[in-house]
Each structure stands twice: as C-alpha cells, then as structure tokens.
Amino acid sequence: MSNYDAEYDLIVVGGGGSGKSAALTAAQSGLKVVILEKRAETGGSSIYAEGTTAFESSEQKARGKPKDGKGHFPTKEEGFRRYTEYSHHRANHEVARMQVENTAETIDILKGLGIVYTDVTIYAYDQPLELYTFHRPDGLGERVQEVLLRACVNAGVDIFTSTPAEKLLTKDGTVCGVLARDEKGNTMSIGGGAVILASGGYGNNFDLVRKYSWQLKNCDTSKLYKCVPTENTGDGLRMALEAGADTANLGALMIIAVARGKTLTSHISGAGSQPILWVNKTARRYASEEVAMSFADTGNTIAKQPDITSYSILDSASVKYFMEEGSIIGLGDFIEYKQKLTRLQAELDQDVADGLAWKGDTIAELAKNVGLDAATFEKTVAEYNAACDKGYDPLFFKPAKFLQAVKKPPFYAIEMTGSVLVSCGGIRVNGNLQVTDADYRPIPGLYAVGMEASGLFGDTYNLDVPGTANGFAHASGRVAARHVIATLKK
C-alpha cells in the first residue's frame, strides 16, 4: 500500500510557462504528471509576457532579416556572449548555453499548437544594443498560456489549482514528493519520481525583496507597488533551501517604472515613462532620462531614489505631443512605439482630482502642490529648459533628441515608482536545471526552472536580449523534463 495520497512520475510545482512546458514534455513522453498551482488559475507571470526570445529560429530564417532593416538576426554564439558579457560573467555558462540552444525549438512547438508569430523584432526601438530576438505572438502571453493549458490537458496532465505545495519530501537525500494543501485546506502527500519547482521566484514577497535584493535592500515595503497580480512569494526558494539547495545571484529583480496605482497600459503611466524631465523628492534631476530606453535600467534607477519615488514633469505642449504624435519610446506591447496616448489628458484630469497627480499654472505652484522645495524646483526647470534651448545637457549629457522643454502651462507632475515584476536570481542549478548544493552537487530528484532558477542574469535583467525571461521559462521547463525522463528510464 502506498504511503502517499497520490503518486506521479513527475510533480510540477507551478503552472506558468515553465511549469506547463515541463509538464507537457514529460506527459508526451508517457510519464504520469501533475501540476500543483497555487492560484485559482494557471499562467503565472507568463500571462503578462509579450515576446519570446529565440536564436536561429524558423521564424528568423523565414524572414531573412528584420523588417526595419536596421539589424540582423543573431546567432546562438552572439546570444551566448551577450548573456555572459552583459552579466560580467555572473551568468552560469552552462545555463546560458542551454538557453541559446533550446529557444528556437520553443517557437516551433508553439507554432505547432496554433500560435502565430506576427514579428521578430526588438523591444525598444532605436535601442542600438538590443538583439533581434523578440518573437511576438498574436495574442501575446495570455494566448500562449491558453494553448499550453489545452495541450497539457489533452496530454493527460492532472492540474490541481488552489493547491500550493508547502514542503518537499525526501528519503535518503533524494526528493521523492511534496506535501501540498488542497482548495479545502486539507494536507495532501504526493509521491513523485522527481519534483520540478516552477513557482516563479519571490518577487511578490516584499519581505524577501527587502531582505535579498540589492536594488531595494532594507527599503520601506509600504512604498512598494505591485502592478502585476501574481503570487510569486518564494515558496519554491524556501522549499529548496530546506532541502539543502544553494542560491546564486539571489538579489536580482526585474523592476519596471509605473505610475503609482496604475497599470502598465495606462496612458498616464506611459507618459511618465518617457524620457522627459524627471526629478526626485529633492526637486532635482537624478539621471539622464535616456535611461528610459531600457525599462530594466529605469527600474534600477528609480529604485535608488528616496521612497522609491520619481516625478515626471510635463507641460501642456508635451501632453499635446504625446496625445497627437505619440510616445517617444515604447514599452513593448504595453505602450507601443509612437502610440498616441489619447487618454492622457482625461487620465491626468482624473488623477489630479483624485490627488494621484498634480497640476500647477506655474512651476512654483506645481512644486507646492507636489510638496517639493519651490526654489530648488524652479532652478531645476530653468536649467533644464536652458539645456533644451541649446540642445545640450551639461549635467547628464542627455541626447538632444530627448530634450523637450517644460515651458507652456499648465504643468503636471506624475508620481512614478518601481514595481517588481519578478525576481531574476534564485536557486542554483546546472545546465540540466538540476538544483545543486553549495558544492555544485545535484540534489537527486529536484529541479528548478523559469524565474525560480538562477543562471542567466547578473544583477540586472538583460534587456539587450528581449524576451529572455519568457524564452527561459519554456526552454528550461523542457530541458528539465527531458532530464527527468532520461533519469527515470535508466
């Protein structure tokens, strides 16, 4: 008689992109597979993904070259070097090699499930460092998760939602199952030949963010804003550590700038993310706003400011420009390049009325309404306008094309903050996605994939290779599952 309430060949903890990819691969090989999903629905952070990175894919080969004519489709070797060099070689070279070797297959698998790719491009137009790896699917991440869910069900994967895994079960140093809690609160013991942790990292656990991250270490967690409603609270990390796992680059986060209290698709958030005039609570500029070209770098920059707060300053001319001419930079599919922000004035008016944004007929009045020192703010704006008139920024060397004066009243201030999307470092793994201890010895039966695993990043998410997190989710899940298959068949 079994000592477990249920038994499977493979237990997958988490039903996002990495978990579904692992489960589908294993089930199609004949293994009995279960997904334990904490939330009431599957998808995780992958629902919010836009593009998927891939190297030497069938889509790239069919197109020949990017349609904008500015770059080329990179080789696997170029991708490998960008991962390792961007991270200053903090990336795990085995994991980076796994990524570039397996992402092209993701595109073919998803195409076989009905996904159509509308473009292979970059994330931020006019960003000269980005590689053309961003495979944009019709319907984006939400559509991809729908087809993967259907494929998993058709392959016979059991999926238990509202069922968080709480503890790994081990025997003689080998992981052999999990304890989970079902939707009624009952504890379930589930035995398995292997466990894959695909639970998304710890980015929504603000206590762990404060403890581990270098960007937000010891921050006031009341100032943190969660703009993506996921529950990636470090469950997999905790269970892995209890089982003897090591960590790597644990403190890296993917942070994006967003208007406080708003979504990434709001036009007020889109305007606030543009490379206009930014000041912090000292009423001074704190960076060259061209950093907006990379949302990851923007997130790092804002995270360092007092109270994780920045103010984006607009005048009526810039509001009119964004509404009629469109954005200067894009934020992927949340705010597209040159997208007309037609709702901006209405959103500003509403937020001013609600006390979430501020308006002034003079710079001094705006400063008073925001709570900034008026004399300092007036000096900052005057110096910035002089730089715009000259086409040269003597303070931070901001490119002339982004120098947009703030002269025509009324004036507005949008409060921007950094929102944690996901953690980018975590459980140490090898190239097979096996979880290892501090001596790099694999813990038998235990794997970590997607943003639960470390390996691709240093201290910052690598936007030079757009779509990396999503590409890693699918590739790592598949590679881990194949190692499980090979191990169980020995």
Question: Which residues does each predicted region cover?
Answer:
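Core beta-strand elements of the Rossmann-like FAD/NAD(P) dinucleotide-binding domain
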Residues: 5-8, 184-194, 442
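A conserved short coil-to-beta-strand element within the FAD-binding core of flavoproteins
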Residues: 161-174
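An anion/pyrophosphate-binding glycine-rich loop and adjacent beta-alpha core
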Residues: 237-239, 243-369
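A glycine-rich dinucleotide-binding beta-alpha-beta segment and adjacent secondary-structure elements
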Residues: 167-169, 362-365, 376-460
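Conserved N-terminal/central alpha/beta ligand/cofactor-binding core
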Residues: 32, 38-158, 162-164, 209, ...
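N-terminal Rossmann-like FAD-binding beta1-loop-alpha1 element of flavoenzymes
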Residues: 10-35, 485
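Glycine-rich loop(s) and the adjacent beta-strand/alpha-helix scaffold that form part
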Residues: 186, 190-259, 464, 470-479, ...
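Extreme N-terminal leader/targeting segments of oxidoreductases
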Residues: 1-10, 28, 489
